[in-house]
UniProtKB/Swiss-Prot annotation:
A zinc finger (RING-type) spans 22-60. This is TNF receptor-associated factor family protein DDB_G0267744. Probable adapter protein and signal transducer that links members of the tumor necrosis factor receptor family to different signaling pathways by association with the receptor cytoplasmic domain and kinases. It comes from Dictyostelium discoideum. The MATH/TRAF domain binds to receptor cytoplasmic domains. Belongs to the TNF receptor-associated factor family. The keyword 4Fe-4S does not apply.
Length: 429
């Protein structure tokens, strides 16, 4: 319980002097401030006035901040001398409902903070509530009276304790369930040999170790249906050696058939895998396109198309199916660049609606030295219809450096591949 949260009006023993009441909120004021003209009110009311008008509610003098006010020490001192009932004497402080079995002390407002620290009826949060989570589904403890706090901690269902068998930390409320159903160190009695075995080793004991457990004959799949104690299995095999020889032949024949079947299935899987690889290659091809754009009379194109003007390429399809509407593209080439500082700009333009991630490259051919070809690779997430990506080249391209052929031709190789389609999203409001 915070002192600042307490409304003292109903705690005061006897009548309250009107001078102690805040003229704005009409509650008993404990933290008292006043303006330069001496008009006083509680701190909370002054803070509200500063926020709204920055002036005193009585004389209208300017108040810049709470720090510009002074405290009324005399009035505060008188108020703090008032006798009050301990807040813990109420079962419902808000509605002033007294609890006859709670604290009966009467103290001053000044001594309240010290009293609450020691009052055995003060409610405290259980520190073990931090151990409650979705995994253990423990319920948090209710607030506890300070006088009962030590006793509660000794028995708190959410306190952590160590398992007496495995030393794992668990909450007290889960102790019984842990020991009865989960603890790996708890001893269980084997129903075959009657030995006590740790729960963590119990299944392994019965499956591989226990000499008294009845197990199937190793030649069960060959036809022997006997159940024999693990300790007697050698004797069983020795006494019935002839029969077990026949059983072993049966098992070998059965295994041979299984092996033939497995080989057949393996061959089918290999064939199917090859088919899938072939289909995948075809599918990959169907989403990619490689082309060569030959632009003749390049010097004329440089004069004809100014900055920001483009040459349009024909429409092309990355799919092998001409009817596919989801794989058409075109190119735009700006011989003098689209903006200042560019020499050549190339736009890849998507002519279908679906958002797609696309890989593409442009390579300007060098007619003198093919190893000097200039290539730019890109990947881009294209949006709706007619979305485009601009690839920019900054070099000078002329006959001297080999990028323009002797017959005045520029050659651009390009490749476009659709990596992924994205579904359309439709929203109805």
């Amino acid at each position: 319980m915070e002192i600042s949260d307490i409304l003292f009006d109903d705690l005061v023993v006897g009548e309250i002097n009107d001078d102690f009441i805040c003229v704005i909120c009409s509650h008993l004021q404990v933290d008292i401030y006043q303006c330069v003209e001496g008009h006083f009110a509680c701190k909370n009311c002054f803070l509200k006035m500063i926020e709204l008008k920055k002036q005193c509610m009585t004389c209208r003098c300017e108040i810049k901040s709470i720090e510009s006010l002074s405290k009324n020490r005399y009035l505060e001192k008188e108020v703090r001398k008032l006798n009050i009932y301990c807040p813990n004497s109420f079962s419902d402080l808000k509605n002033s409902i007294k609890d006859e079995n709670a604290c009966k002390d009467i103290i001053t407002i000044e001594g309240l903070e010290t009293h609450l620290k020691n009052c055995k009826f003060t409610l405290k949060e259980c520190p073990n509530n931090k151990n409650c989570n979705d995994d253990n589904k423990n319920k948090e403890c209710l607030k506890i009276r300070q006088g009962e706090f030590d006793h509660h901690l000794k028995e708190c269902p959410n306190s952590l304790i160590k398992c007496e068998h495995c030393s794992i930390e668990i909450t007290r409320s889960k102790q019984t369930d842990h020991i009865e159903n989960h603890c790996l160190k708890v001893l269980k009695q084997c129903e075959f040999c009657f030995k006590l075995i740790e729960r963590g080793e119990f299944n392994n004991h019965q499956d591989t170790i226990c000499l008294s457990k009845l197990i199937k004959c190793p030649f069960n799949e060959g036809g022997c249906v006997d159940l024999v104690k693990r300790s007697d299995i050698k004797e069983h095999l020795s006494v019935l050696a002839g029969e077990h020889l026949l059983y072993s032949i049966t098992m070998i024949n059965s295994l041979s058939l299984k092996l033939e079947k497995s080989n057949s299935e393996l061959q089918e899987s290999i064939s199917y895998s090859r088919l899938l690889k072939k289909d995948f290659k075809e599918l990959k091809k169907s989403k990619s396109y490689s082309g060569r754009w030959v632009i003749e009379k390049w010097s004329e194109k440089l004069k004809q198309y100014g900055k920001g003007q483009s040459i349009q390429f024909q429409k092309f399809n990355t799919s092998t199916s001409p009817s596919s509407a989801f794989s058409y593209f075109t190119l735009r080439l700006f011989p003098n660049g689209q903006y200042n500082g560019e020499t050549i700009s190339i736009h890849l333009v998507k002519l279908f609606r679906n958002k797609s991630r696309i890989s593409f490259s442009f390579e300007i051919e060098n007619h003198i030295n093919p190893s000097s070809n200039e290539e730019i690779d890109s990947r881009f997430l294209f949006g709706n219809l007619n979305d485009y990506y601009s690839t920019i080249f900054y070099k000078e391209y002329n006959k001297e450096n080999g990028f323009i052929s002797e017959d005045d031709t520029l050659v651009i190789h390009f490749n476009v591949e659709i990596l992924k389609y994205y579904d359309d999203t439709f929203i109805t409001k």
